[in-house]
């Protein structure tokens, strides 16, 4: 689970949890690989809003108004540290957004670490809404965002 190391322990998923999430009907996940070494570079994944609302976790109140929308909740867009600051997060995010739009979704929703990850979403047109200053007791500020797809 190479990507889990990027996150606070309170936010890390077990392999079983991640497999369950990615096995949800309608989940959309993409991975980026280094073509020369075939090493993983990044991942992005999300599930339909109805599936995200099955959890009773922090931030779910942000999602309630969207329960009947064609919305995808993005759990993660992550680039391994050695590949960060090279524009690859933007490429990965763009591809994931394209796949989600192609599947017929109208909205992307998520909670992203502020300011870095939130800035990536804002660069694609996301609006930052609610702020969560101690997301899952990590001491980190996360912002809820909404991104309308064209």
Tell where the protein language model's regions lie, with residue ranges:
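Conserved beta-strand-loop-alpha-helix junction that forms the acyl-donor binding cleft
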Residues: 84, 109-119, 134-137
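Conserved acetyl-CoA-binding loop of GNAT-fold acetyltransferases
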Residues: 122-131
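Residue-level recognition of the GNAT/N-acetyltransferase active site
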Residues: 75, 80, 113
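Conserved acyl-donor/pantetheine-binding loop and adjacent beta-alpha core of acyl/acetyltransferases
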Residues: 39-76, 84, 135-138
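Short amphipathic alpha-helix that is part of the acyltransferase structural core
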Residues: 1-45
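C-terminal "cap" of GNAT-fold acetyltransferases
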Residues: 133-150
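Short acidic/polar active-site loop segments enriched in Thr and Asp
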Residues: 106
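Conserved acetyl-CoA-binding loop-helix of GNAT-fold acetyltransferases
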Residues: 79, 85-98
């Amino acid at each position: 689970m190479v990507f889990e190391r990027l996150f606070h322990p309170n936010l890390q998923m077990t392999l079983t949890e991640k497999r369950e999430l990615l096995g949800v009907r309608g989940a959309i996940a993409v991975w980026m690989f280094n073509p020369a070494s075939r090493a993983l570079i990044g991942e992005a994944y999300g599930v339909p809003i109805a599936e995200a609302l099955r959890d009773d976790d922090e931030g779910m109140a942000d999602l309630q108004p969207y329960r009947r929308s064609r919305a995808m909740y993005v759990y993660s867009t992550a680039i391994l540290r050695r590949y960060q600051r090279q524009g690859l997060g933007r490429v990965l995010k763009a591809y994931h957004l394209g796949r989600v739009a192609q599947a017929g979704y109208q909205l992307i929703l998520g909670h992203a670490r502020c300011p870095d990850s939130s800035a990536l979403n804002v660069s694609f047109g996301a609006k930052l809404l609610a702020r969560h200053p101690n997301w899952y007791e990590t001491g980190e500020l996360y912002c809820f965002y909404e991104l309308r797809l064209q």
